[in-house]
Amino acid sequence: DPKTTLTGDFTFEQIPVDAWRGNFDLNLVGGVLLPCQEFCPAMLQSGRGSVINIASVSAHIPLSRVIAYSAAKAAVLSLSQFLAREWAAAGVRVNTITPGFFPAEQNRKILFHEDGSPTARTESIMGHTPMGRFGEADELIGAAVFLASHQASSFVTGSDIRVDGGFLSQTI
């Protein structure tokens, strides 16, 4: 389904418009815009709240073959920074978490062969990740708990917490 395609054997010129729309609908409209419009008025009225949006390392460094996804995630970062400035005076904090590479069902086919051995892409990712491994769900949860805690992060807004094993510290 081109609307949910995150990767593919397309050059930039070949990426279907539906893939662009699908990525922006899923990641920006469905993942940030609509939830913020639905839930943030109550936070703004109460004078307190924390919005945590999910970006991607590919928002910072657009990766080959996933440019529609990269652009949508870069838009998540941009909108989150705007909302952080817009809502800070009302007491609502807006931050992002940028995950590195976490094995998930949606990317298993590009990371591992059917026999479970790593693909060339996995070996490349690990070679560019100083910690030399994939992330684990608990590591993302820890960042989210920190950002959600008023006590721990009441002065944190407009920030991007990178949970990427150092991936973005490397030059690709």
Language-model segments: which ranges?
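Short C-terminal tail/terminal secondary-structure segment
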Residues: I61, M131, V145, Q151-I172
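Residue(s) in the substrate-gating loop at a strand-loop-helix junction
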Residues: S56
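Alpha-helical segment proximal to the catalytic Tyr-Lys
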Residues: P41, R85-A89, S154
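A conserved structural motif in NAD(P)-dependent oxidoreductases
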Residues: G116-S117, T129-L140
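Active-site loop-to-helix junction immediately N-terminal to the catalytic Tyr of the SDR YXXXK motif
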Residues: P62-S70, F82, I110
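A glycine/serine/threonine-rich, flexible loop-to-helix segment
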Residues: F10, A89, F101-H128, Q170-I172
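Catalytic Tyr-X3-Lys loop
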Residues: L6-L33, I52, V76, M131
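Active-site helix of classical SDR
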Residues: C36, A72, S80
